[in-house]
């Protein structure tokens, strides 16, 4: 599962060992301080679904090229667990595949024409 390996790399040996051995739960504030989470949502429960869907929409069609977002996620998830030179090779491979996509052509055309891109995921 990788929990011990990942947590140790993220928060350090001492804190990871303490948490896993004692079963200590981490507060949202501590998780944020250790960079395990990026944000703490503070709205009320009735607005949660709407706020999450609004936030997620920035990562989906037509607002973002989904292949690019997927490749960024893949590189960021895989990269830290492989040697640096392999991470660079993975990044080059993923970028090369994107440059041949319809979304890349659309992104370049939109930039040149000074308009908002309309990505399709192709």
Predicted features and spans:
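CoA-thioester-processing core
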Residues: 1-20, 34, 51-56
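Glycine-rich phosphate-binding loop at the start of an alpha helix
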Residues: 1, 25, 105
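Hydrophobic alpha-helical segments typical of transmembrane helices
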Residues: 3-6, 15, 68-71, 91-94, ...
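Conserved N-box asparagine in the HATPase_c
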Residues: 114
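C-terminal long alpha-helix characteristic of the crotonase
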Residues: 28, 34-89, 102, 118-122
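Well-ordered beta-strand positions
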Residues: 18, 22-24, 30, 39
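C-terminal and late-domain segments of enzyme folds
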Residues: 97-98
């Amino acid at each position: 599962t990788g929990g011990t390996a990942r947590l140790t790399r993220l928060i350090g040996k001492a804190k990871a060992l303490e948490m896993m051995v004692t079963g200590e739960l981490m507060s949202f504030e501590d998780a944020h301080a250790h960079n395990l989470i990026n944000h703490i949502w503070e709205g009320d429960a009735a607005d949660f679904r709407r706020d999450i869907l609004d936030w997620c929409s920035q990562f989906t069609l037509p607002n973002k090229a989904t292949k690019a977002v997927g490749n960024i996620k893949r590189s960021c998830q895989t990269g830290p667990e492989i040697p640096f030179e392999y991470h660079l090779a993975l990044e080059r491979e993923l970028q090369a595949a994107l440059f041949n996509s319809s979304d890349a052509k659309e992104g370049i055309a939109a930039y040149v024409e000074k308009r908002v891109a309309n990505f399709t995921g192709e």
